[in-house]
């Protein structure tokens, strides 16, 4: 299990302001175990000892996992090919979600990395409804109304890159819309 890269990605999310304060959460799957950020954690200050462990049924092995545990579990239970999940409250994506504006994939990188974006109506944070709505999406990049984004991948780096490209696309949409 590569917790060093997991921690590095958490720090990048914080350093690049994709999360602020104790917002956002990250997980990776290793067999029947999920390594996930703890509730109330500041991703920029996270270390290996802080990471929680649960099994695929939600039984807690170590720590107190994020309140979005149900969402992570449902995604892993519904998608065998997913081994990493990144959930952020990145500013531009969240702003577009609040306005119900769809993002255009302006760059070739976005078309390759993001491909298509799913949009999920608002559900309360940590709710089973949110978990079910997100896990039913076939897309790997999901924008949550008034909440943020979820990206998934075969590994933590892939999920992170989707987060980065999705937020860049939101910024480009903002700039292009304001230059028209």
UniProtKB/Swiss-Prot annotation:
Binds 1 zinc ion per subunit. The active site is at 68 (proton donor/acceptor). Its EC number is 4.1.2.17. Gene3D superfamilies: Class II aldolase/adducin N-terminal domain. InterPro entries: Aldolase_class_II_sugar_metab, Aldolase_II/adducin_N, Aldolase_II/adducin_N_sf, Fuculose-P_aldolase. One of its GO terms (molecular function) is zinc ion binding. It comes from the Archaea. Substrate binds at residues 24-25, 39-40, 66-67. It is an enzyme of class 4 (lyase). One of its GO terms (biological process) is pentose catabolic process. Coiled coil: none annotated. It catalyses: L-fuculose 1-phosphate = (S)-lactaldehyde + dihydroxyacetone phosphate. Zn(2+) binds at residues 68, 87, 89, 147. Its cofactor is Zn(2+). SUPFAM superfamilies: AraD/HMP-PK domain-like (SSF53639). Keywords: Lyase, Metal-binding, Zinc. Pathway: Cofactor biosynthesis; coenzyme F420 biosynthesis. Belongs to the aldolase class II family. AraD/FucA subfamily. Involved in the biosynthesis of the coenzyme F420 which requires phospholactate produced via the aldol cleavage of L-fuculose 1-phosphate and the NAD(+)-dependent oxidation of (S)-lactaldehyde. Catalyzes the reversible cleavage of L-fuculose 1-phosphate (Fuc1P) to yield dihydroxyacetone phosphate (DHAP) and S-lactaldehyde. PANTHER family: 3-OXO-TETRONATE 4-PHOSPHATE DECARBOXYLASE-RELATED, FUCULOSE PHOSPHATE ALDOLASE. Homotetramer. This is L-fuculose phosphate aldolase.
């Amino acid at each position: 299990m590569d917790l060093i890269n997991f921690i590095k990605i958490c720090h990048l999310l914080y350093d690049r302001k994709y999360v602020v304060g104790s917002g956002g959460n990250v997980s990776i799957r290793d067999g029947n175990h999920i390594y996930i950020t703890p509730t109330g954690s500041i991703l920029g200050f996270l270390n290996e000892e802080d990471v929680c462990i649960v099994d695929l049924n939600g039984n807690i092995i170590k720590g107190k996992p994020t309140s979005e545990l149900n969402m992570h579990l449902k995604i892993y239970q519904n998608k065998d090919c997913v081994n990493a999940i990144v959930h952020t409250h990145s500013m531009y994506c969240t702003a577009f979600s609040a306005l119900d504006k769809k993002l255009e994939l302006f760059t070739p990188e976005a078309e390759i990395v993001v491909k298509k974006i799913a949009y999920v109506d608002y559900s309360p944070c940590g709710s089973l409804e949110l978990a079910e709505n997100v896990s039913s999406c076939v897309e790997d990049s999901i924008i949550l109304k008034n909440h943020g984004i979820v990206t998934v991948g075969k590994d933590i780096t892939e999920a992170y890159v989707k987060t980065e490209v999705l937020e860049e696309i939101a910024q480009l949409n903002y700039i292009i819309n304001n230059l028209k």
